[in-house]
Amino acid sequence: MARDATKLEATVAKLKKHWADSAPHDMRAAFKSDPGRFERYSLSLDDLLFDWSKCRVNDETIGLLKELAIAADVEGRRAAMFAGEHINNTEDRAVLHVALRDTSSKEVLVDGHNVLPDVKEVLDRMAAFADGIRSGAIKGATGKKITDIVNIGIGGSDLGPVMATLALSPYHDGPRAHFVSNIDGAHIADTLGILDPATTLVIIASKTFTTIETMTNAQTARKWVADALGEAAVGAHFAAVSTALDRVAAFGIAEDRVFGFWDWVGGRYSVWSAIGLPVMIAIGPEDFRKFLAGAHSMDVHFRDAPLEKNLAVWLGLIGYWHRAICGYGSRAIIPYDQRLARLPAYLQQLDMESNGKSVTVDGKPVSGPTGPVVWGEPGTNGQHAFFQLLHQGTDTIPLEFIVAAKGHEKHLDHQHEMLLANCLAQSEALMKGRTLDEARAQLKAKNLPESEVERIAPHRVFSGNRPSLTLVHDKLDPFALGRLVALYEHRVFVEAQIFGINAFDQWGVELGKELATELLPVVSGEESSDGRDASTQGLVAHLHARRKA
């Protein structure tokens, strides 16, 4: 069925009324009166558990949210994506990052062309190159083995590889991986400053080979290699992830060191493509294929599971409920896993660049809120930074906890148990809170004077009823990471379909780029700031004065 705008609008209205009527809903009371709440409001896929029972929902909420998914034609749009239809309507492109991890023998067609053989060919070339670097068969210009790789990219060409490389550090048995993204010269200076050009491979990740930040850093790295080893050495110390073969060749990189991808792969969905080359070099082709396999397992689940049993659908529906119905403008991603420290930033781009839109696919203003602000840090660090606001602040911010049942360090299992206890405690504390009477009783138990009890007790009250959901998997390995990231990709898709927006363009990044190009000669003093707004003129004048001081 097609998207039913009338039914969708009516269901949203029902949800808003339902929320208004159930706003006093007390989760503590709900858990006491309903012993089956966890079983009804959780789903599993193999070892991956998704628990949303600590969100402020009931059976009526769940029924209405399912109606919403049907009215938005989530299933139909999902089928269109997997079929290679041009669902990115503003750029007239297919959206097929799922093909990058499709290990089946089925055809995946884009405009009548089966793309799977192309995907396999690039993946096999990546594997051969990675094996050569890792084994030492492919050496630097001086004959030394490559010990370090530097990936130069930005946005999707950086955030995904950074996140995955850190997350899978227990599986590293190849060269050390470093990442440079910022145009700030400090980033590349600090990175190259600790490396030896003779044992370093630089990967330039830019589809067009024109991204200003990436190419500026690439030229700096090129000069670093050429100054140390000579111009002739450049080719042996660079590789590229790009489709601009002429520009890559002009830079000095041979075609057999260039790995491409396709316009049906968006940057924030590209870690599965040749953009993942630094990950593959770090962990090896075999584990990289497990990473892809984990994502594919979630793709199959998302594609085939019915709505009521579909983890990605319900993660998306709960996200929509929190944002558009409850009015929560922020979403905190809290992995209780230090190796997932960069996951919140990765999901920040995935979600905010996809769903940070204010017009529908038809170019009309949206009728309500769209994507939330996404942020986070690992637990337990966050507990000692911003959890104060999450527990006692005036804004309600839903949390999404991510944790593994088992850690990698067997000799530190007692510390992992402490980590697990903290994760569960935060989830429970947000839900339960602490009443004024409970705070008084706790203080009285410490034999404080009555006056002191009354003075301090209000400060120890926690309102509770603050929503959180929890994702638990067995262990953070390549398969589990791939599955987790794909889950969030599909969650973003589901939310976008209900919002009625295109999750696969990012026009919002363009205006600032255009103005930066205009302002560069103004900042450098080659052109006047005349004609610009008074604030910009004042800032330019101040910068000119301070740079000369």
Curated annotation (Swiss-Prot):
The active site is at E353, H384, K513. The keyword Isomerase applies. Its EC number is 5.3.1.9. This is Glucose-6-phosphate isomerase. Keywords: Cytoplasm, Gluconeogenesis, Glycolysis, Isomerase. Pathway: Carbohydrate biosynthesis; gluconeogenesis; Carbohydrate degradation; glycolysis; D-glyceraldehyde 3-phosphate and glycerone phosphate from D-glucose: step 2/4. InterPro entries: G6P_Isomerase (IPR001672), G6P_Isomerase_C (IPR023096), Phosphoglucose_isomerase_CS (IPR018189), SIS_dom_sf (IPR046348), SIS_PGI_1 (IPR035476), SIS_PGI_2 (IPR035482). GO terms for molecular function: carbohydrate derivative binding; glucose-6-phosphate isomerase activity; monosaccharide binding.
